[in-house]
Amino acid sequence: MASYVAAIDQGTTSTRCMIFNHSGRVVAVDQVEHRQIFPRAGWVEHDPEEIWSNTRQVCAGALAKADLVTSEIAAVGITNQRETTVVWDRKTGKPVYNAIVWQDTRTDSIVNELAADGGQNRYHRKTGLPLATYFSGTKIRWILDNVDGVRARAEKGELLFGNMDTWVLWNSTGGPDGGLHVTDPTNASRTLLMDLETLDWDTDICAEFGIPTSMLPEIRSSSEVYGHFRERGVFGGLPIAGILGDQQAATFGQACLSPGEAKNTYGTGNFLLLNTGTERVLSENGLLTTVGYKIGGNDTVYCLEGSIAVTGSLVQWLRDNLGLIASAPEIEQLARTVDDNGGAYFVPAFSGLFAPHWRSDARGAIVGLTRFVDRGHLARAVLEATAFQTREVIEAMNADSGVPLKSLKVDGGMVGNELLMQFQADILGVPVIRPVVSETTALGAAYAAGLAVGFWGSEEDIRSNWAKDKQWDPLMPEEKREAEYRQWQKAVTKTFDWVE
């Protein structure tokens, strides 16, 4: 009998496969990084074929590490970096261009053109999103407008669009030989092209963007059997039964299943999601309204989201571009060599600022520098930037929801950094709680798949599987907390109006 569920987690920097048991504990994981391609300033790309090759590799690796055979896996779920855009030929399976990554800002002029009539919130009521370079719609439009011959091919119905969930699913189920062209509402709600109420593509918006609807995948629920893996390959014949965008997957994996429950994922960027139940709350404070999940035929659950572009990737930058650390975990050790930031604040607006500012004209800045500031202070300022940005989003969330946050569930790669977690509790003034399984993104996708095939009986099983690992309570006096935050807010204003 099948005693395990697998999840493919296609992220911004790597692809991995994780295998979970019935208690939601990790049995095995295999992970491979892929190249980050930076053709110009502000441009970020991935090679979709490299990612598909890595996907097959990690599925085989995880199964081998777990010492399991395919028949012991009940189902497979997919979770993915959202918004990242792939356009490919439906007959050959070849991408017409590299994947344009969510952080990429090349579509600024398209955003400005669309915002000229109706402003940044032109599509906000229907989609829950502001016009921004972040979302897939403008990226599809850029590929259609800038890659030779692509628009004509798209209009003839020869090309397909997908985010990474769709790209992995299509290839896993046969590719040009009958591959499924499907997505779920959590991913579709990040394109700027889906109506949040109907959960369908909005033909008027697609027409205004100049995107043929024939390119777009079918939108199905987040938890159902979409199809089966092609017979060739390590997971041959297994049902693919769950799809969730990475941040919604983490929300589901964290068991934030009731209105008012929230989680913050610390990854390449930070993503704070608050469950608002079946109500679509339109933000007045720079947050996104997004689909949280739709489990089979159940009602759609919505979330408010605060997206922060640069957090974990700032640590990467410190390692790769400046060489101040040799590996990401070293930053905590370096930051502990000093007691504070020495008056230095680092605003990592590498690709503008996301929530709650939505300023694509902003660029990164280190302010407050003196001769006193050393490597340790810079390391500390890098970590503190993550916590300060999180507070900005939580204040916007409190204003929109009218419900002050009482505690924060955290997950993702950076939550192993105890200095950061303590500072996060200090700057928020509420407890920060880390679960036993901190990589909840893959777990959420596994839950969605397992529910679809009856491996788990109900969402209550998810809640009962959740367990606390550690809690950090605030220790900083309120007066100091507010003084630090005021300095941060002042630093943020110094990054505006940089790009003409």
From Swiss-Prot:
Keywords: ATP-binding, Glycerol metabolism, Kinase, Nucleotide-binding, Transferase. GO terms for molecular function: ATP binding; glycerol kinase activity. Coiled coil: none annotated. ATP binds at residues 12-14, 268, 312, 316, 413. SUPFAM superfamilies: Actin-like ATPase domain (SSF53067). ADP binds at residues 12, 16, 268, 312, 413, 417. The keyword Transmembrane helix does not apply. HAMAP family: Glycerol_kin. Key enzyme in the regulation of glycerol uptake and metabolism. Catalyzes the phosphorylation of glycerol to yield sn-glycerol 3-phosphate. NCBIfam families: glycerol_kin, PRK00047.1. Belongs to the FGGY kinase family. This is Glycerol kinase. It comes from Saccharopolyspora erythraea (strain ATCC 11635 / DSM 40517 / JCM 4748 / NBRC 13426 / NCIMB 8594 / NRRL 2338).
